Design a protein with these regions (language model features):
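Juxtamembrane loop-to-helix connectors within ABC transporter transmembrane domains
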Residues: 18, 26, 91, 95-99, ...
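An intracellular "coupling" helix at the cytosolic face of ABC transporter transmembrane type-1 domains
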Residues: 28-31, 119-120, 136-145, 149, ...
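Helix-loop-helix
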Residues: 63-68, 72-75, 165-179, 249, ...
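Alpha-helical transmembrane segments of multi-pass membrane proteins
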Residues: 80-99, 146, 150-157, 178-204, ...
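ABC-type nucleotide-binding domain
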Residues: 346-611
């Protein structure tokens, strides 16, 4: 499986860096946003005013050699500084709030939308890609929205304010300084673009190093058995050498950039000193020493907001990719959607109208069904017809790629037929909601998935309000209690991520117990192909028989010896039923099923003899 979407897919830039698309996520917190913007603006005003305090002190106290009024001046100055500290604390807190709130809402929106997407989306996109959209992209967007907003407001207000004050103090001197602003902007833009490309390359190489390191650890046994230690070392060495070269090149650009900015700032100071000093010594246009000093501070301070704003624009260009990928995820439509009429009556995934749900009995019928995947060209099923009465146990047999999983996926409405209809209790499955159907289906995969948490928490997924007595009865019915009793903490034992702390058989039995609690009318089992011990296999067979009683069931059979009691066995090849009947009937025909069964029986006999 490969990632279908990459960084290069987003070459078209959105207006305003895609930020308007985030407005709905900021609206609930507009009070915090406005308050933060106002306080940041006030902080900018204070930063502009602070050099004026210096000017006043030099001109009125130092130059005149008097201390009259100094106490009041110092008191006012301390109050202003204290006010700025308070504003800064509130700003930082509110920026954190916005980052956390927006990040949380972005994650919720993306995760909730993922719950509504069909299987095809997860087949086409890797887990790593989806994880990056939900976690990395949302974190980066939340950060740039909060801190980027604060930095932009402060730097813009400070930049505009400083230029205005400089022109008020001395417009001729201000022109000399402002004339250098475009030069600084162009220099900053040039170096920032280079640094952005290099930083991106550093991140890419770092990902390669991490991947190579993980492969080296997880594949250590393979590396040793193939005797490729030297090749692995060379590959890892080349990647780390690329990292060294790129990092040094990045550092070189950054050092050059800082040096040029410092030179330009020094040049601006020299201009101010030369021109301002001349004005200070000319009687006609006398300029006070304090005024010259504050002007120099403003000229020097002008460089920082320009650099920051250029860097911010560069970051916005980069984060636009994250915004685009996030909004594309939310815009992705499911291949299987309920019609507006169905949603109106039955509700949707998050707001079901259970009071309108009819009971499901379990009659299933395929009417001239043809199916191909959305991005496929060939049909997996063609003109497929099958009628399964309520309570029938159907076993599906066939080679890999014959269409077995496609059949049960259509029953579960994980995919829609390209042509034809699937009827549930005599009605087109599309006439009722997906949630209604899924609530009445129990699906146990080849490798059952257990959620991180305890055994009890996993069992309650089948029925959240189940009593302990119901849970214990369900476990006993499928013999899961024999596995659970062996665990150190019983029902409170941790199953690990994906159930990794349990054996394959243990996960199977717990998933069966979970299905019993859900009490589905249709049961689907993709039989496990992995080998398990004889005792556990016997327990699983008993569990399957219990689950199938009174329910319509579809079993994708891999071990044919386990389906002898099926009411009907379907032998599928290339999307068509080539044989159907009971085990005895098919064995008497000595057709495709007979060949598969005898071949597997002989193979199992050989394996048992060697074991």
């Amino acid at each position: 499986m490969t990632e279908k979407t990459t960084h290069s897919d987003y070459k078209v830039r959105l207006p305003w860096f895609g930020l308007p698309r985030l407005v709905p996520f900021l609206k609930p917190y507009k009070g915090i946003v406005i308050c933060m913007a106002v306080l940041v603006l006030l902080n900018g005003v204070i930063d502009i005013c602070l050099p004026l305090f210096q000017q006043y002190a030099i001109n009125n106290f130092i130059a005149k050699g008097t201390l009259q009024g100094l106490g009041g001046f110092i008191g006012l100055y301390v109050c202003v500084i204290a006010l700025q500290i308070v504003f800064s604390m509130i700003d930082a807190y509110q920026a954190c709030q916005i980052e956390m709130y927006v990040g949380r809402d972005l994650k919720r929106a993306s995760f909730n939308h993922l719950q509504t997407l069909s299987f095809s989306y997860f087949n086409q996109n890797s887990v790593g890609y989806i994880h990056a959209r939900v976690m990395s992209d949302t974190n980066r967007i939340g950060s740039i929205v909060a801190w980027g907003l604060m930095d932009t407001v402060w730097n813009l207000s400070y930049l505009v304010g400083v230029i205005v004050v400089m022109f008020v103090i001395n417009w001729r001197l201000a022109l000399w300084v402002v004339a250098l602003t475009p030069v600084i902007t162009l220099i900053a833009a040039f170096f920032q673009s280079k640094l952005t490309v290099l930083n991106r390359r550093v991140r890419e190489i770092n990902s390669q190093i991490t991947g190579n390191f993980n492969e080296g650890i997880t594949g250590a046994k393979t590396t040793k058995t193939l005797v490729v230690e030297e090749k692995m070392e060379q590959d890892f060495g080349r990647t780390t050498e690329d990292m060294r070269k790129t990092s040094i090149r990045t550092a070189r650009y950054r050092a050059t950039f800082i040096s040029i900015v410092m030179f330009t700032a020094s040049f601006a100071m020299a201009l101010v000193l030369w021109r301002g000093g001349t004005l200070a010594m000319t009687s006609e246009t006398l300029m006070q020493i304090g005024t010259l000093s504050v002007f120099m501070n403003y000229a020097l301070g002008l460089m920082e907001p320009i650099q920051t704003l250029v860097r911010m624009i560069s970051e916005l260009i980069n984060v636009q990719v994250n915004i685009e990928r996030f909004t594309n995820l939310l815009a992705t439509r499911s291949d299987v959607e309920d019609s507006p009429e169905v949603v109106e009556k039955y509700g949707d995934t998050f707001q079901p109208k259970r009071e309108n749900w009819e009971p499901l009995y379990g009659d299933v019928e395929f009417q001239d069904v043809s199916f191909k995947y959305p991005d496929g060209e060939e049909y997996i099923l063609e003109h497929f017809n099958l009628k399964v009465p309520q309570g029938t146990n159907v076993a599906i047999v066939g080679e890999t790629g014959a269409g077995k999983s496609t059949l049960v996926n259509l029953v579960c409405r994980f995919f829609e037929p390209t042509k034809g209809r699937v009827l549930i209790d005599g009605r087109d499955a599309r006439e009722r909601s997906q949630l209604w159907l899924h609530s009445n289906i129990g699906y146990v995969l080849q490798t059952p998935h257990l959620f991180s948490g305890t055994v009890l928490e996993n069992l309650r997924y089948g029925k959240p309000d189940a009593t302990m007595e119901e849970i214990e009865a369900a476990c006993k019915a499928v013999s899961a209690d024999t596995i659970i009793d062996q665990l150190e903490n019983g029902y409170d034992s941790d199953v690990g991520e994906g159930g990794d702390l349990l054996s394959t058989g243990g996960k199977q039995l717990i998933s069966f117990a979970r299905a019993v609690l859900a009490d589905p009318r249709i049961f689907v089992l993709d039989e496990a192909t992995s080998s398990i011990d004889t005792i556990t296999e016997h327990l699983i067979q008993n569990a399957i028989e219990h689950l199938m009683k009174g329910r319509t069931s579809f079993v994708i059979a891999h071990r044919l010896s386990t389906i002898r009691q099926a009411d009907i066995i379907l032998v599928v090849d290339a999307g068509k039923i080539i044989e159907r009947g009971t085990h005895e009937e098919l064995m008497q025909k000595k057709g495709h099923y007979y060949t598969l069964y005898t071949r597997q029986f002989e193979q199992e006999a050989v394996e048992q003899a060697f074991s």
